[in-house]
């Protein structure tokens, strides 16, 4: 008796189309001879992190809803298929397993474009007949690209190379690409239109000295490192060599919105007042944002995968409805009176690090951070938050040595849901080897008010580190009276 098995080959299809080069500069020297030599490549969809998708679904009012536009960068993948256009711009990709992909096409000197969520069916697929969408199943607030729309043609425009100083008002045009090869200053107003791409060579800085504006909705503009942008193969930009720094100064009241900034080292620096950063995506790099000013607001923004200090803030500002994910020394608030509310801090080394000042930390969610809040000589009000699964401490205090004496912390910790069972919830002495600023000294000079909280632990002393745990600590963490039921008004509202 014998048996045999057969394997079914997956259904495959082809994709054909045409890319044209359009010289809209008015310079006849840039007129193309033909449309050959354009690279066309097909990539698997970017992975949508299930952690962020879960937060998007549970709290749709915070952060940015991720999709292919926010997550896809062709430099992080090998292509599924690729080819080069003929003289008339035509191309054909063959033997593609049926499914959904992202299409990338580029030519040196002519920029690069992405088309998201291309569906390849069995048999022949022609680009002009294919429906594509930019947001897949996760909608972006105030965007109307969720419905599928016909692609009539693929177009590339000449790359624009920017000089070191631009005196007049400047527009980053829709669907155009810009390469910055040296430090560049914009002295007059700047407009970013939808889907404008700016590529900055490693080591370069961009300064905006006047107003900067961009649309409230529509396709996102993007600023990133130029490293590896014009190759179809895997070529992840190296953060160590990229000193890309974007500085906005001298003009109050800018609204930075609806864009994506990636692969930074020194980050976006704001040196002006009344600036709003909203509906932005910052990803992959060292420092995301440095704020130097007053009345600054960051809201409905996603900041993820930064390897060093993610944010350094000075001045008085409001940080609300953001997602901070997978960063290192995450939200540093230095010498400031900040209001930090309705944010989700997840899988960071440090969620918030207040340094001096009287920060209000209210209605946030801290999940799976090594340290939820690690304060240094600060007096924050910590209320109506939720703390889940901190790997070391939910909250710790640290002193700061100034010349011949120590400055200490005096937090007020009330009305929080604290779910710590197998780790320390609150410690008033930091671990000297792990905390970035940790001195090993006791962080307070008085008892700490941690009353009116809900505790999952039955024996609360087991999740505290105070005078009962060390001979050098002479102060208590006061937890009575306590709340016996989960506080419904705590956490993100």
Put a short name on every predicted segment:
Residues 93-95:
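Short, flexible loop/turn segments at beta-strand junctions in immunoglobulin-like
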Residues 89, 99-109:
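A short, solvent-exposed beta-strand micro-motif common in secreted/extracellular proteins
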Residues 142-493:
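Extracellular beta-rich repeat passengers
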Residues 47-90:
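Short, acidic Ser/Thr/Gly-rich low-complexity loop/linker segments typical of extracellular
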Residues 8-10, 128-141, 145, 154:
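Conserved "repeat-terminator" motif of extracellular CCP/Sushi domains
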Residues 106-138:
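Structured interaction patches on ligand/partner-binding surfaces of diverse proteins
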Residues 97-99, 176:
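A glycine-anchored, Pro-Gly-centered beta-turn/N-cap motif
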Residues 1-25, 154:
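Bacterial Sec-dependent N-terminal signal peptides
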